[in-house]
Amino acid sequence: MSTLADVSSDITASAAWRKLHDHHGALAQRHLREIFAEDPERGRELTLQVADLHIDYSKHRATRETLQLLVELAREAGVEAHRDAMFAGEHINTSEDRAVGHVALRLPAGRTMTIDGADAGAQVHEVLRRMGEFTDALRSGQWRGATGERIETVVNIGIGGSDLGPVMVHQALRHYADAGITARFVSNVDPADLVAELTGLNPATTLFIVASKTFSTLETLTNATAARRWLVAALGEDAVAKHFVAVSTNAERVSAFGIDTANMFGFWDWVGGRYSVDSAIGLSVMATIGKERFAEFLAGMHAVDTHFATAPLEANAPVLLGLLGIWYANFFGAESRAVLPYSNDLARFPAYLQQLTMESNGKSVRADGTPVTTATGEIFWGEPGTNGQHAFYQLLHQGTRLIPADFIGFARPTDDLPTADGTGSMHDVLMSNLFAQTKVLAFGKTAEEIAAEGTAPNLVPHKVMPGNRPSTTILAPQLTPAVVGQLIALYEHQVFVEGVIWGIDSFDQWGVELGKQQALALAALLTAAEDPAPQDDSSTDALIRWYRAHR
């Protein structure tokens, strides 16, 4: 078995990769209709139950032999060794020499995980205790604003992982908001974002959560400063301490802003932003749903962590789904994956996954600094069903690109209404569409079948549904805090598996840094009194001069 010392080895030169290459050559032209005919029980047998999640991976262009070969690839790449190293707190983020400890954020009380010589579990639960005390005070009305009024709205100011996770989870769990506190979210440095979110708010009943680990993120501090001016204009300077709290580790900057450091909630270098919604970054979520529901959310994540850490690779959901991602990206040439939640409350889930997957695995060098030798990083995108059916499913069904899809649905709705004739459930209509789409994507409809229906010959080729389009279906009883946690962890660990096989560091993001530096350098040129010096390239120079002339 491979060890961490083998991280620099090129998996594309391995025996397992060559076997998959040869196997793909034999399988590529086979249709799912044929695969199901030869293996009629696969629809019942190629499923996994992980906590509340029922996962059907039978509609993939993969035979049982394919799955065996993919598992062999995972073993040769050292997936088990890397997984165990992560759970042991080792520094698997090699470019930054850091541990990767997001799994510690959802450890049950009393469980330990040593990171950098400290008990991460104990550290996490101390922060959770403080978060719980604070949100209890908010929700009960014990915490009052500067005028003595109760807080009714929390506004989370963050960006990237400090925004996408809380926004997504808040929307997904809106039915669990039960204390009269609503949440709004500001991320974009475009002033329209902040202005829109402040519209209609009463400063006396508004609390801001400024989420920035270093308390120096340009977009976040720009928005926070503007929000501070808005508050001070209404309530005065002394009100800041009662209307701002921070999620940060920089006590000096937090204090200078006017926030009492007793109301600063920290997290650690071993938590990446895109893996942080279950840390203090989730404070806005806890404020709306309460600490008990937040604990259920964490327990859902931990349930999938335990499955990932202990299940054999052959029956390990994140491993198999990550391997199928490799199968399509590297052997079929697929470039993207559609994520299609048949739940409007999960509307932001695809955007959340975009950061999780693309910031993690959008790398062109391996962990040892050498160039990758195969495509990396899936492009994730999607919209809720059934909206997408009337927008882009046409390309999924009849286009020339292979786009694997993940369908997510629930047995019981968070809201339901009767159908137009009053005899049925709108949720049943929604779910019938999910099942129909996965069936048609997989099996399609042949020219012979269409002609047999009496279709005009000239229309037959236009109506052919090729099928052979792969998908995973993930079902759960209902969209609960635990299930949201399970879904997040399921995808987190898929990303991990893919990154290990590609030999890349899935936990850094150096690609975002240069743009930040360039923006700071260019900002002064946009408003300078004198004409700026010419830029290195004529395009940027001309754009800056156009902007200056028209602002």
Curated annotation (Swiss-Prot):
Organism taxonomic ancestry: Bacteria, Bacillati, Actinomycetota, Actinomycetes, Mycobacteriales
Job description of the protein: Catalyzes the reversible isomerization of glucose-6-phosphate to fructose-6-phosphate.
Enzyme type, top EC level: isomerase
Similarity annotation: Belongs to the GPI family.
GO CC, alphabetical: cytosol
InterPro entries, per database record: G6P_Isomerase, G6P_Isomerase_C, Phosphoglucose_isomerase_CS, SIS_dom_sf, SIS_PGI_1, SIS_PGI_2
GO terms, molecular function: carbohydrate derivative binding; glucose-6-phosphate isomerase activity; monosaccharide binding
Record's protein name: Glucose-6-phosphate isomerase
UniProt key word Iron-sulfur: no
Keywords attached to this entry: Cytoplasm, Gluconeogenesis, Glycolysis, Isomerase
SUPFAM superfamilies for this protein: SIS domain (SSF53697)
Pathway: Carbohydrate biosynthesis; gluconeogenesis; Carbohydrate degradation; glycolysis; D-glyceraldehyde 3-phosphate and glycerone phosphate from D-glucose: step 2/4
CDD domains (alphabetical): SIS_PGI_1 (cd05015), SIS_PGI_2 (cd05016)
Enzyme Commission identifier(s): 5.3.1.9
Pfam families listed in its UniProt record: PGI
Origin superkingdom: Bacteria
HAMAP family: G6P_isomerase
Reaction catalysed by this enzyme: alpha-D-glucose 6-phosphate = beta-D-fructose 6-phosphate
